[in-house]
């Protein structure tokens, strides 16, 4: 499928992980690729791709997944739902191209990109094993969740665009629904990603053990070989 993208890193041998990055409104995949450069050295066997939004935005070089003109709490979910099949198809495309399954796929988004990665797991549970949502939110809070995906919310404490309250509400909803979630608040940070945000993200991918591993251990089971994500 044809879509705007920027390959940050492509390993010489078959990829062991897939990291897909999604930018905010008006940005582009090359710019978001700078974030990918933080992940690439720590995951040398990963295919790292920054994916552009499906449609142009007001900025001549910018892209978006859905328009924010006239957006409200009442119509946001419908706009997300309208483009979601294309978003999921894009993730599936890169999984097929890389030969990497959902168990070793991480979706990383900022702002509108974070909305899309969060909503994609709501629409297609198990699409990826990890989600990192920088300064994002759900269009509407999830009522169900599973531990198949570990969700890491990283949010600026002073975000004037997407209020921190949305991240707190998302964490509470996911916990209530039985999901696997972490929330890190970056003090004094607005609607942006800084070094502290990145350190939270890198540490989670390397060191945070998914909750379902503990659940399987407590039940006397163990993860299958195809259910182990080498992100840690």
From Swiss-Prot:
InterPro entries: AB_hydrolase_fold, LYPA1-2/EST-like, PLipase/COase/thioEstase. The active site is at residues 111, 159, 191. Its EC number is 3.1.-.-. One of its GO terms (molecular function) is hydrolase activity, acting on ester bonds. Pfam families: Abhydrolase_2 (PF02230). Keywords: Hydrolase, Serine esterase. Belongs to the AB hydrolase superfamily. AB hydrolase 2 family. Displays esterase activity toward palmitoyl-CoA and pNP-butyrate. This is Esterase YpfH. The lineage of its organism: Bacteria, Pseudomonadati, Pseudomonadota, Gammaproteobacteria, Enterobacterales. The gene is ypfH.
